[in-house]
Amino acid sequence: SHIRIPDGGPVPDMVHYHRVGFQLIYCYRGWVDVLYEDQGGPIRLHAGDCFIQPPEIRHRVLEASDGIEVIEIGVPAEHVTEIDHDMTLPTSDLRPDREWPDSQGRGQRFVHNVGSDAQWHPFRLQGFIARDTTINDATKSVAGVQVVRRGTGDPQWAKHDADIHFTFVMEGTFTLEGEGKDPFRLTAGDAFVIPPNMRTRYSEPSDDLELLEVTLAGTFSTTVA
């Protein structure tokens, strides 16, 4: 989901949680303040920052800026949200290493990744660089999230074997070429999914290109094709 709220201010939220296998909150524009179970006081998520909300972690949204925009990815997309009438946030405990089990018994840690602290490295696709959000490690490879920018070199045709491969265009433009498909010129606000083993190429990327890539699983193979 791409969520946009034009008028900010205090949010009349209650302590709640989601019965979900994986959930990402990426701040695209503006900022939002949130309380999380066992993570201390209010945390402000700025543009370029992200959270993952482990399964059933209690949380409450406090306040948001005008024009806040967030990208929310939940798996499954349709899931149950429940109110916790007994818990008060913040909790007295600070447990940054706590793990919340998913339906498969794998523990997931809360992640607050700050964009301004990013270190950029070569991406899995030639011609691009990426910042790893540590979500692959925190979820034991349930999911991976990277922010991608234009690097050096010419983009090449490649394919992947991830079960789910979703990308949101945050800034800039490029042409998405797919095997057996017409090319699409994509711009900020567009999104796409690439099926496993489909040959694609990100051609003619603008210098200001920035992509949000979300994959399940977090660890997968990419083959130049």
What are these model-predicted stretches?
Residues 2-5, 11, 16, 28-31, ...:
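A structural signal for the main folded, soluble domain(s) of proteins
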Residues 3-6, 17-34, 147-151, 159-177, ...:
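Short, conserved beta-strand element in jelly-roll/cupin
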Residues 12-19, 36, 43, 62-63, ...:
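Short histidine-centered beta-strand/loop micro-motifs
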Residues 1, 7, 80-150, 223-225:
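A short, N-terminal "cap"/entry segment at the start of jelly-roll beta-barrel domains
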